[in-house]
């Protein structure tokens, strides 16, 4: 699949990029039953298609988030409920967009190179 991944043309908007990727992701994951394998591939596709600094997931384990598959620099392994952007999004049950992490109270700097987050 990686060799045949079709990406949007240079300058395409986010919506168009997602529309092109969605059927490919469905095809990529339709015959695979392993959650980790599918999550890992979806993350790799998103990183390649959008060039994000970091793409990954955390899994809820008791009262903390535990790092799952990701692409990018080293990440925090565990994040407590209600802490940082990820823990706050989990606690509040909502998506959080942070344009400037320095402006987010309690931001956890897993990487000093990260300047924004979408959780």
Spans of features found by a protein language model:
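A short, aliphatic-rich beta-strand micro-motif
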Residues: 115-119
């Amino acid at each position: 699949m990686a060799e045949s991944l079709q990406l949007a043309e240079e300058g395409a908007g986010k919506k168009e990029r997602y529309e092109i990727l969605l059927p490919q992701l469905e095809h990529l994951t339709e015959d695979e039953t392993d959650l980790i394998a599918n999550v890992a591939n979806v993350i790799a596709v998103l990183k390649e298609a959008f060039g994000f600094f970091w793409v990954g997931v955390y899994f809820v384990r008791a009262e903390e988030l535990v790092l799952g598959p990701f692409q990018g620099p080293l990440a925090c392994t565990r994040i407590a409920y209600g802490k940082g952007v990820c823990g706050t999004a989990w606690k509040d049950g909502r998506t959080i967009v942070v344009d400037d992490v320095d402006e987010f109270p309690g931001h956890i700097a897993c990487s000093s190179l990260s300047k924004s987050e979408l959780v």
